[in-house]
Amino acid sequence: MANNQAAKKRIEIAERNRLRNRTYKSALRTLMKRCFVACEAYSKEPGDAAKATVSASMNAAFSKIDKAVKVGVLHRNNGAHQKSRLSATVRQVLEPSS
């Protein structure tokens, strides 16, 4: 248990940040899952509407990742890794290698 006021305040701040980071990461994972689902839907039935959905979901996920890095929820290397993983999946679906 914390003995002084500063330590008690740091505990409160850490808990506040933990909750904020948890919601941010949850939203980020949701957007990434939506992008992966859109990729699967496009691979099953290719079309302009499905392609637009993939593109929109990828842009939303990229935006959320960039904001998470900016705020400090994610480390920039982790953000780059997530974006790379997402773009590789999208590239594989949209431009299948012959």
Curated annotation (Swiss-Prot):
Role played: Binds directly to 16S ribosomal RNA.
Query: Which keywords label this protein?
Result: Ribonucleoprotein, Ribosomal protein, RNA-binding, rRNA-binding
- The keyword RNA-binding appears for this protein: yes
Keyword rRNA-binding attached: yes
Gene that specifies this protein: rpsT
- Which family does this protein fall into? Belongs to the bacterial ribosomal protein bS20 family.
Under Gene Ontology molecular function, one entry of this record is: structural constituent of ribosome
Q: Tell me what this protein is called.
A: Small ribosomal subunit protein bS20
Q: Which InterPro entries match?
A: Ribosomal_bS20, Ribosomal_bS20_sf
One of the GO biological process terms: translation
Instruction: Pull one GO CC term from this UniProt entry.
Output: small ribosomal subunit
